Amino acid sequence: MVAKALAQLITCIILFCHVVASVEDLTIRQVTADNRRIRPNLLGTHTESKFRLFMSDYGKNYSTREEYIHRLGIFAKNVLKAAEHQMMDPSAVHGVTQFSDLTEEEFKRMYTGVADVGGSRGGTVGAEAPMVEVDGLPEDFDWREKGGVTEVKNQGACGSCWAFSTTGAAEGAHFVSTGKLLSLSEQQLVDCDQACDPKDKKACDNGCGGGLMTNAYEYLMEAGGLEEERSYPYTGKRGHCKFDPEKVAVRVLNFTTIPLDENQIAANLVRHGPLAVGLNAVFMQTYIGGVSCPLICSKRNVNHGVLLVGYGSKGFSILRLSNKPYWIIKNSWGKKWGENGYYKLCRGHDICGINSMVSAVATQVSS
């Protein structure tokens, strides 16, 4: 144990020295918008030319010179943040993303959205899922390969991740019970759901202002279910509630919270379908690809709702000097982010709080 800890410390020191010594010309791979080419991103040199390249790749425009200068300054800071993330998380690739002109506060407000519940599991109290047999689970598992996951969606500049996590779980549960995959309406939740956590009346579902997946389940049980995406399409902003009970496609029967145990999470995933989860998205702002296995990532600052769709058995972690199993996570920032819209995160030790807010839902077909 001492030798392993010493080896990890030496590795960290080497990585830190490398970053500090070469910050002016450190190269981080940047996947461009088409996800087919890779360009070098020279940190600290020719910052403005790199900023213009970023603007071109991601279709960014600024209305005034003042705004341009402001965003350029933020971009320069985020390039350095990407270098720091690369050092802390070398088994993944970090660099310039579509969020590189946003402050951390702007990023959290516009692109995350799980309500702050003070580090607790949060949300309406559902029954805790019964313990599930974990022996015999497959080494690797992916609901995408079985046809149980819809295409990656895009929440836009709206803190509605909680709605996408909720619909993803309902879509998966419906697929497990019927064999049919439907794309369900996030906009119904954004417009109509105002359910609150009974333990914290400030933690209410509030459209683009954030919410909780368990609150959303409670709303759906009371409202009668979810419409399909095609009948209630997403707009990226809150509007008047247009829910039509006659158009309900899937009804929510109940929901459960999954125990804080990674084997139980994996077993429930395999047996019951994709799971709604919350996590700390701090490393996701600069994430481009690979298995993210950060040395330090707070478990308490859970702020983003995503969908757990599978797991893999072998993702090499440089800092941890071994192969580590990982989760496969569907995000809601479009296909140009991450690995075609997906995130891989190390399993073990509740990294980034991934175990702390996991729930499953049971559905039935609308009659």
Curated annotation (Swiss-Prot):
E.C. code: 3.4.22.-
GO molecular function terms listed in the Swiss-Prot or TrEMBL record: cysteine-type peptidase activity
Pfam family, one: Peptidase_C1
Propeptide: 23-136
Residues at the active site: C161, H304, N331
UniProt keyword annotations, A-Z: Disulfide bond, Glycoprotein, Hydrolase, Protease, Signal, Thiol protease, Zymogen
Keyword check for Metal-binding: no
GO BP term (any one): proteolysis
Disulfide linkage: C158-C208, C192-C241, C297-C352
Xref: SUPFAM superfamilies: Cysteine proteinases (SSF54001)
CDD domains named among the record's database cross-references: Peptidase_C1A
Top-level taxon of the source organism: Eukaryota
Leader sequence residues: 1-22
Glycan attachment residues as annotated in the record: N61, N254
Keyword Disulfide bond belongs to the record: yes
SMART domains recorded: Inhibitor_I29, Pept_C1
Task performed by this protein: Probable thiol protease.
Family per similarity comment: Belongs to the peptidase C1 family.
Protein's recorded name: Probable cysteine protease RD19D
Organism from which the protein derives: Arabidopsis thaliana
Gene assigned in the entry: RD19D
